[in-house]
From Swiss-Prot:
An example Gene Ontology biological process: ribosomal small subunit biogenesis
Name by which UniProt lists this protein: Small ribosomal subunit protein uS4
Organism listed in the record: Porphyromonas gingivalis (strain ATCC BAA-308 / W83)
GO CC entries: small ribosomal subunit
Keyword Transferase: no
Molecular function (Gene Ontology), one example: structural constituent of ribosome
UniProt similarity note: Belongs to the universal ribosomal protein uS4 family.
Lineage: Bacteria, Pseudomonadati, Bacteroidota, Bacteroidia, Bacteroidales
Length: 201
């Protein structure tokens, strides 16, 4: 499946959750898209709920099936709670870290910044959105990219104390992943246990 590039409000309505950020359409039409979306509330099967939660996580983080499955198997092999580790690994993706630091307004925009070589890790350019950031690594904006309007606009008024597992230095336009976040600190409304159950079948 290719990465979705269509109307984001339609996907947000599908899940009944603003997975791409604040959504004016969702606030007015918080029911599935389609002609009869507001009246069609069929009971969803257990498998359907599990699949829906996986799709929701993939859309939220902008991850394709192969990448998502790889992260799940990595979480399975690691020591700890598989579902929580999966969410932590998704959070540690470079594109997500760039988004969380406020360098980009959305994960999609963050992915573009990384792909177009505007982002550095420990001083070296990294253009792989799926790169896994480790605690202690410094994520910065490339010197020649610091004047980009999209970055300046995103950083304006951004609350850098929002995510306690990160640190930001405005003078150098760089931030650091201090530690992996606790699941309770991650605001995404994802029921990761349903994803674990789906892959465990």
């Amino acid at each position: 499946m290719a990465r979705y590039t269509g109307p984001k409000s339609k996907i947000a309505r599908k899940f009944g959750d603003p997975i791409f950020g604040a959504d004016k359409v969702l606030s007015k039409k918080n029911y599935p898209p389609g002609q009869h979306g507001n009246n069609r509330r069929r009971k969803t099967s257990e498998y359907g709920l599990q699949l829906r939660e996986k799709q929701k996580a993939k859309y939220t983080y902008g991850v394709l099936e192969k990448q998502f499955r790889h992260l799940f198997h990595r979480a399975q092999r690691a020591k700890g709670v598989t579902g929580e580790l999966l969410i932590q690994f998704l959070e540690a993706r470079l594109d997500n870290v760039v988004f969380r630091l406020g360098i980009a307004p959305t994960r999609s925009a963050a992915r573009q910044l990384v792909s177009h070589r505007h982002i550095t890790v420990d001083g070296s350019v990294v253009n792989i959105p799926s790169y896994s950031v480790k605690p202690g690594q410094v994520i910065g904006v490339r010197e020649r990219s610091k004047s980009l309007e999209v970055i300046a606009d995103a950083l304006t008024g951004f609350n850098h104390s929002k995510y306690p597992w990160m640190e930001w230095d405005q003078s150098s336009l760089s931030g650091k992943l201090l530690h992996m976040p606790d699941r309770t600190d991650i605001p995404e409304n994802i029921k990761e246990q349903l994803i674990v159950e789906l892959y465990s079948k």
